Amino acid sequence: MITNYFSIIHVYFIFLKIYLIRKGELVMKKILLLIAFMLLTLTGCGEKNIDDAINDFSKDVENSKSYKLNGTMEISSGEEIFTYNIDTYFLKDDYYKVILVNQTNNHEQIILKNPDGLYVVTPSLNKSFKFDSVWPENSSQAYLLQNLVNDVKNDSEATLEKTEDGYIIKSTVNYPNNEELTYQKIYFDNDMNIKKVEVYNAEDIVKIKVTFKSVDLKAKLDEDDFLLDDLIDTETNTENNTQTNENNANTECTGENCENQNTCEGENCEEQTNATLDSIIYPLYIPSNTHLSSSETIDTETGERVILTFSGDKNFVIVEEVAKVSNEFEVIPVFGDPLMLNESVGALSSNSISWHSDNISYYLVSSDLSTNELISVAKSLGNASTVISTK
């Protein structure tokens, strides 16, 4: 009887031991799963994936009611690099102001968009192009945060790279007027603050680089910061131009050898009021089977105008004249889009480009050239272009 009793107790302890072992294993499994989950959570917090990065970036931009960016933009063209100081202002909804100052010649232009329209203002000439355009929604823009967000969201194959300094998002770009540009890299610090944008061609060469010195996503801007009238000091420009004209008109001479005077006395003195071109600038890029067929210089009421005609498979005309300062602020309607050339922001239409550079106004027109060919010809009329003196 006693033996049977101890046998029962022994069996009971065996089952109890098995139960405790199994229960312990279950507890250990739960502990291990908890530890694994915590490790995964910590790992996820340490390094983002592409979706996390895009969400963080887009959330910051979309939550911003207005922002202000300051930095530099470099545009590479051949062996030359053109550098701009750039300030970007944005206010919801659809208010933009981009101030570009060429570091080489201090030439300033301003891209402005408000409910009245889209403008490219050149204060030094007291002029502005006014566009019938949906800019900036119709293309990528390395200096506008909304466009960068759209680029990465629209690229299902965008990638994320973790670096020592932060993150790099790589995505495709959409530059319909520049097929050379294919992809971009957007650089962030470890807190996903944007630092730099590089736009590449198919040969992995950086063609555009925007470096942000400061980014304020909580800028206190209002509609008054986007007024066209504030960009042009019309009264000051008018006074300066009037004073210049008066000074020219009052400059007189009486000798036979007087030169370069606006008014004078004497038989051999001639009135010299018109602006003259010191040189003719020819494009370095000319499409194949196309040649310069004529070069004509004509006198207009405001100065000399050079007309270069190119004939062949791709006919086109280039008009060059000294840029004229308007006494009153002038708005020139354009059906097209702003175009960033090497040294200037121009106006691109379906068959022409207009722009100002180094005190010369250019107009390029053709019914044969494609948009990319138009741009190639225009860009080749830069500092490296063939220059022939007219004197």
Regions found by a protein language model. Give the residues of each.
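Short, Lys/Arg-enriched N-terminal segments with co-localized hydrophobic residues
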Residues: 3-27
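Sec-dependent bacterial lipoprotein signal peptides
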Residues: 19-43
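N-terminal leader/targeting segments and the immediate start of mature chains
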Residues: 32, 41-95, 156-161, 256, ...
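N-terminal mature ectodomain segment of secretory-pathway/periplasmic proteins
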Residues: 46-121, 168, 173-178, 182-190, ...
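Flexible, processing/modification-adjacent segments and terminal tails
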Residues: 49, 115-178, 390-391
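An acidic-aromatic
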Residues: 87-143, 201-211, 364
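Gly/Pro-enriched, hydrophobic low-complexity segments
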Residues: 164-232
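Short, solvent-exposed recognition patches
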Residues: 246-358
